[in-house]
UniProtKB/Swiss-Prot annotation:
UniProt GO molecular function: NADH dehydrogenase (ubiquinone) activity; ubiquinone binding
EC number from the UniProt entry: 7.1.1.-
Residues forming coiled coils: none
Spans traversing the lipid bilayer: 11-31, 43-63, 95-115, 119-139, 143-163, 175-195, 217-237, 251-271, 285-305, 314-334, 340-360, 382-404, 425-445, 472-492
GO biological process, one term: electron transport coupled proton transport
The encoding gene: ndhD
One GO CC annotation: plasma membrane-derived thylakoid membrane
Top-rank taxon, per record: Bacteria
Protein known as: NAD(P)H-quinone oxidoreductase chain 4
Organism in which the protein naturally occurs: Prochlorococcus marinus (strain NATL2A)
Presence of the UniProt keyword Lyase in the record: no
Subcellular location: Cellular thylakoid membrane
Length: 538
């Protein structure tokens, strides 16, 4: 071997994976271009692929899945007078999502091949967003997290405002108002936690914050603000309305970034900050997360069923599936929380595949209205096969990743003895409604697109060519891990199970403290303690 293993293990892989695509983006304006954008497309693809290979190398050369603690850690003094340091690292919560980010971005660059309007700006934004999103999962400082969180807002805003559909300005403005406005809660909570001790220099590092003995009232206040901020990004109903509008106007590669990566930032942040750094507040808020998860599943599934616009139908389907992430995070079992983590990875792959196919179908039919489609299966048989495979993955067909992740959440929550049995039965029964609705609206969607009576006007005007090799390759790259995880989930769960176990143990200790307090209150007053805490009493 040319490079010794110790050097590879201590190589700054994460910093390289963050700055390489950002520096690559800065070079994009200087790429020679003959007017067709061919050169910049290949350049962006090479940069994105190298970034993906860097994250893969980080996993295999510097990351041990059996270890619970932080790995690949780098810390450099940045602005010491303000208590700011450049610190990055990875554990089981972040490493799978770092890999997912670089993988989806590489495919999004390939999906953006047909972009001809301002291609340099488009690929500049994709590469810059790649580095920013990896930073969200890799940084170990709350102020750095806030900066990385904000960095990805502007590329998405420009994607929507410049390359979006007819209502692009409305969708872009709504996106920036929701996400930038809610980000203020992250900044306020981060400053409050960093300055908690008072007197000395603030410390915003995750490790330092996890060791602080925050008061319960302080935790509840910070938890509430962070829940709003991360709930917008997840999204949680009723903070979700920006997402259908954004998806309704976005192009295929932007769809892939939104569904594949952006929504996962909210789920990751709930685990990293709310569950890990604020355990006492999480023990009290967890039942609310469960209820919100059920609302997400049922409301979004019913709304998706009623949608006649293809993009909005898939957008609401995404919101429904993210409800399982909320239930898993709200559970106090390693199996349930592990299922939430797997659901984020699974949905990232499945959501990216479905939205890419939506874009590919629109490029041919020039319509998103299901009422205007029908009977195109005879002309696009390979496209129909790709749609069918991805729809089956979304409806959680056994043997695919969606099935095992949702099953883990269900079983983990139902067997979680922290909650009372009646509460578990009611939640499981209601969530099952969403599981039943999903195949109904997805299979009916396939029927309306590909079967039934042909729309003569559509058939005569549209270029109904079948899937091209580039499109087949993108879907194949997404289906391989979807099926691989579905058949052998340990390949993914082993990556983060040690970190999940440590997180759940910390939260269970908080549950015991809450139970002790509740027992004291009940013995003294013999009164109900309220609906949020009641499910904790078993």
């Amino acid at each position: 071997m040319l490079i010794p293993e110790p050097i590879l293990a201590h190589f700054p892989w994460l910093s390289l994976s963050i700055f390489f695509p950002i520096v690559g983006a800065l070079i994009v304006p200087f790429i020679p271009d003959k007017g067709e954008g061919k050169e910049v497309r290949w350049y962006a693809l090479i940069i994105a692929l190298i970034t993906f290979l860097i994250t893969v190398a980080a996993y295999f050369k510097g990351f041990d899945p059996s270890q619970e603690g932080l790995q690949l850690y780098e810390k450099v003094s940045w602005l010491p007078d303000l208590g700011l340091t450049w610190s990055v690292g990875a554990d089981g919560l972040s490493m799978p999502l770092i890999l997912l980010t670089s993988f989806i971005t590489s495919l999004a660059v390939l999906a953006a091949w047909p972009v001809s309007y301002k291609p340099k700006l488009f690929f500049f934004l994709i590469l810059a967003m790649d580095g920013g999103q990896i930073a969200v999962f890799a940084v170990q400082d709350m102020l750095l997290f806030f900066l990385a969180w904000e960095l990805e807002l502007f590329p998405v805003y420009l994607f929507l405002a410049i390359w979006g559909g007819k209502k692009r300005q409305y969708a872009a403005t709504k996106f920036i108002i929701y996400t930038a406005g809610s980000s203020l809660f992250i900044l306020l909570a981060g400053l409050a936690m960093g300055f908690f001790q008072g007197g000395g220099m603030p410390d915003f590092g995750y490790t330092h914050l996890a060791q602080q003995n925050f008061g319960k009232g302080f935790q509840l206040l910070c938890y509430s603000g962070l829940l709003i901020a991360f709930g917008v990004k997840l999204p949680i109903v009723p903070l979700h309305t920006w997402l259908p509008d954004a998806h309704g106007e976005a192009t295929a590669p932007v769809h892939m970034l939104l569904a594949g990566i952006l929504l996962k930032m909210g789920g990751y942040a709930l685990l990293r900050f709310n569950a890990q750094l604020l355990p006492d507040a999480h023990a009290q808020f967890a039942p609310l997360l469960i209820v919100l998860g059920v609302v997400n599943i049922i409301y979004a599934a019913l709304t998706s069923f009623a949608q006649r616009n293809l993009k909005r139908k898939i957008a609401y389907s995404s919101i429904s599936h993210m409800g399982f992430v909320l239930i898993g995070i709200g559970s106090f079992s390693s199996l349930g929380t592990s299922g939430a983590m797997l659901q984020m990875v699974s949905h990232g792959l499945i959501g990216a595949s479905l939205f890419f196919l939506v874009g590919a179908t629109y490029d041919r039919t020039h319509t998103l209205q299901l009422d205007e489609m029908g009977g195109i299966g005879q002309n696009m048989r390979i496209m129909f096969a790709l749609w069918t495979a991805c729809a089956f993955a979304s409806l959680a067909l056994p043997g695919m990743s969606g099935f095992i992740s949702e099953l883990m959440v269900f079983v983990g929550f139902v067997t979680d003895e922290v909650y009372t049995l009646p509460f578990r039965i009611v939640v499981a029964s209601l969530a099952a409604i969403g599981v039943i609705l999903t195949p109904i609206y997805l299979l009916s969607m396939l029927r309306e697109i590909f079967f039934g009576k042909e729309n003569a006007k559509l058939i005569s005007k549209a270029k109904l060519v079948d899937a091209e090799p580039r499109e087949i390759y993108i879907i194949a790259c997404l289906l391989v891990p979807i099926i691989g995880i579905g058949l052998y989930p340990k390949i993914m769960t082993d990556t983060y199970i040690s970190s999940i176990d440590g997180l759940v143990k910390r939260d269970l200790l908080a549950v015991e403290r809450i139970r002790s307090d509740q027992t004291t209150i009940i013995s003294n007053s013999n009164l109900s303690i309220g609906t949020i805490e009641a499910p904790l009493l078993d």
